[in-house]
Every structure is written in C-alpha cells, then in structure tokens.
Amino acid sequence: MVFSDVLQEVSSRVEGSIGYVVMGMDGIPIERLIADRRHNFDMIATESTTLLRSTRQASEELGAGPLRELSFATDQFTVLAVAITDEYILLGALSNESNYGKARFYMKRAALRLEKEFV
C-alpha cells in the first residue's frame, strides 16, 4: 500500500485530524497529508523532530531500547509519534476534540503496515 493511502485512511477514521506525516528521524518528510489548514502542520512536524531526537537519545542513554511512541498535548492540539522502524516515524497532529485512543490505535496499525514498505 502506498504511503498516501495509509495516511488518508488514518485521517478518514479519526475526526479532528490536523495532519499526518511519514518522516525520518532527521525530520525529512517522505509523505504528508494535511487535513486541517487552521494549524501550521509543517511547523508542528518540524518542531516535533527536535523533541523526538532528544527523547530517542535519552531512551538510548538509559538503556531503555528504541523509542516506540511519544505524545504531547498543548492547549490547541495533541501530537502523537509512532515508530515505523528505528529510523522512520508516523507523526500525527490532532485537535483536542479528537479521540486520542482511536488515533493511537489507527496510527499503530498504520505503522505496522508501513513497516513493510521499508523492509
């Protein structure tokens, strides 16, 4: 399945989606989908990579293994990152009215499907 199809499927199943991106841990996007232009999704994704890299480094230094998932919430949105591989992630931004558990479920499922594209 193509990346854009997977992103579209997640977005269509999660109300309040702002956007989704498949990207490397270096922050370079492979495919993105913007569902709600009221927020600057590209900026959200770019700034989130700094946090992802720091958290990944902390996880490694603690000997806790690779980073698998990270989320944070603000007054305006929630960001969820799910590892596809050790080097690639699926990052989503959701409105605070979104069902976080539902988004997490569909994003984890999507990450498993996307992992096959990197093997």
What does each of the following model-derived ranges do?
Residues M1-V119:
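Non-catalytic interaction/Regulatory regions outside core domains
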